[in-house]
Structures are given as C-alpha cells and as structure tokens.
Amino acid sequence: MIQIDTIPKELQSIQPFVRRFNELEAHNPVIAYWSLYWAAQMALSSSHGVSNECKDFLLSLIEHLEDLRKNLGENENVSDETSAKAYVESFSLEVLVQAERNSKNGKPDVQAYLAARDFLELSRIWGPPTEQITKSIKFCKLRALQVANPQRKAKTPSNHATEELQQSSTNSTTLPTQEAAVETNASASHETSFALPTTSPAASLSISPTKSAAVSSEPNVEADVKSLSSTPAAPQLNSPSHSYEPTTFPSTTSITENLPTIDPTRSTRSSSHIQSLSPESKQTSDGHRPPSPTSITTTSTSIDPSVAFSSKSTLATTRTNAPLSRPSQPTKASPLNKFSALEAIQSARSHARYAYSALDYEDTTTAIHHLKSALKLLEEEEQGNHTAD
C-alpha cells in the first residue's frame, strides 16, 4: 500500500489512481497493477524539472510496480495488450453499470461514479480512448455531480467527495448510449471489493470511502463544473421514475347491499358458488322469476329469495332507507304438486346456495331460513313420492 500523504504536491494528479491501487491490491491485482502503471506514466510525463523529492517518490513507485508485475507472472491480462485492454474496459463498464443500478434503486453513490471514471481513464494506457469510453467518462463526472449537488448544500466545504468533484472537469454533457458491459475474461477473474454485476438481482457495489480529494490534471476545472451543474438536460436521480395515482374508491353511500353476494376478498372456495346464484338462471314453473337482488337498495334487511319457490310465501314488506328501484308484485307460487321432482330438487339446491352465501357474511338468520325452506321442499317432495307409491 502506498500512503496518499507521501505523494508530493507536484504529483497530486496521480492521487485517484494510487487510491484505486490501494483499494484493489489485495482483491484484484490486475486492475491494481494497471492503476499504478497509469499513475507512474502520468508522473513520468510531468517529471521534467521536478524536485528531488518527486524523483525519489517516482523511483519507489516504479520499484513497487515491478514487484507487482513479477507477482502476476504470465497473466494474459497483463502480458497481452489486447486482452489487457479488453479486461480493463470490461471491468470499468461493469462498475459504471452497477453504479447506475444502485442509483435506480434509490442508493446513488458519488464514490461509485468516481471509481468508474478512474477505471475508464485507464484505457488511455493503450492510446486515445474510443468515443464510447470518452462519453462514459463524461457521463460518470456528470452523474457524480448530480448526486453530490444536494449533498453539498448540507455538508461543510471540507467534504472530500465534494472537493474531488469540484476538481473534475468536462467539456461536454453528452450522455453515453446504454450498452451492455463487456463480459469479463474468465481466466483472469478475481475477487474484488467492487462487486461485479452477476445474474443475481441482489448483487451490489461496495466501494471503500476515501480520505482525500483527487486533483484533476485538466484545466478550467471550476468553469466546467459550473457548466455541468447548470446543464438543463441532466436527469435527476432523486426524481421518481414512476408516477402512481391513488386508487379511487366509490363512496360508501352509493354502495348497495346485494344479498347474497361474495366478497371479492373471500376464499376461492366460497367464490366458486357465486355463478350459480344469478337470478336469471332460476325460474318457477308459472314463468315468474325471483326478484333480482340488484333491484333493491337496502341498509337493514333484504328480500327473501324463497318467495319464488315456496307455495305459501308472499313478498314480505321490508324496512329500507332508500326507495325500491322496481317494486315487485306479490307472486303466488304454484302448488308443489305442479313441480316435477327435478324442479323441487333444483329449488332446494338454490336455497342451500343462498344459505351458504349468507354464512359468508355470518348472517345465520338468513342461512337458517333458506335451509329450512330447502328441507321443507325436500320433505314435501319425498312425501309426494310416498303418496304416489
């Protein structure tokens, strides 16, 4: 591990990459190696005219890099240029994809976007980055600024993440198109503190917090950050991705009690009987239908469905708080001897179903009444059979 505070002031621009090296040295030595390699290359490019302190630090950095290279041996993601570039870009894009997932899940992390930015910068080792990598780098900076903006209002200026963002720069706010991350080379997969996306939806990105701010080597930092912060087209992380409207419920005064009916929250066992309770399916032998339950609005009692089947029943006067929508005339049921045995059994079944439905509402009085009516029909039908015999 390289102590950040030992980096000379003239080489502060390499801090982010030294920090990534410290974070991944024990978990992903390949990415750690390339992070330190890029830090050394940046330091060498700016070593002209530096102090002896900087030269000593640079020599120790190169020695550390050589030791790490020996430990990696013949790893193709280090020895082979094409494989190394593909592996670094794949890892970088995976970190960015995971940062976006966390943001969409309501857990945006500034450090996740900053880490993705640093890893994407490593592609410069093999020449100018592609257009997609360039857009992804700018996208990381923009997203990090969007996450940090509300935090900067509540935190002191000494906040390290805010300081690092203020030193980041960009010349464009063009967002990259969504592309799937390149699959990581299986031969060089390592356990890493940056949890890579997997098939499991519970995969998460864990980035160790840093203790100091990174200094960008790009010019006009403050102006670029200001332009990023005021970009009108920038998406807001904190805004909800979906809009839900409250469910509209009907007024309780407009609900009519239709007995018997099945509460939609009841079990499927009880709901299976509702289809057989339709009044249109029940008809007496003289052509009269039982009064429809939906034609009556009541708050205290209900019309007895047995009037269509009983030989002695008449329509009882009910106490209601609302007028009858269609007054029913008292019906005279046909004598039982005009019923066929099949019709009597069917009528008894209807009473039993009404009783069953009434029990769903714990209306034992109605249930008992219909059960008695069903038993009476069956007893009279049985008595008629004995008489005929």
Swiss-Prot record:
Pfam families registered for this protein in UniProt: Vta1, Vta1_C
Domain of life of the native organism: Eukaryota
Membrane topology term: Peripheral membrane protein
Keyword Endoplasmic reticulum tagged: no
Chain positions covered by the region annotation Disordered: 149-335
Family matches, as InterPro entries: Vta1-like, Vta1/CALS_N, Vta1/CALS_N_sf, Vta1_C
Keyword list, A-Z: Cytoplasm, Endosome, Lipid transport, Membrane, Protein transport, Transport
Biased composition (Low complexity): 294-306
Compositional bias of kind Polar residues: 156-177, 184-219, 227-282, 308-334
UniProt keyword annotation of S-adenosyl-L-methionine present: no
Subcellular location(s) of the protein: Cytoplasm; Endosome membrane
One Gene Ontology CC term in the entry: endosome membrane
GO biological process entries: late endosome to vacuole transport via multivesicular body sorting pathway; lipid transport; protein transport
Subunit description: Homodimer (in cytoplasm).
Family membership: Belongs to the VTA1 family.
UniProt name for this protein: Vacuolar protein sorting-associated protein vts1
Gene encoding the protein: vts1
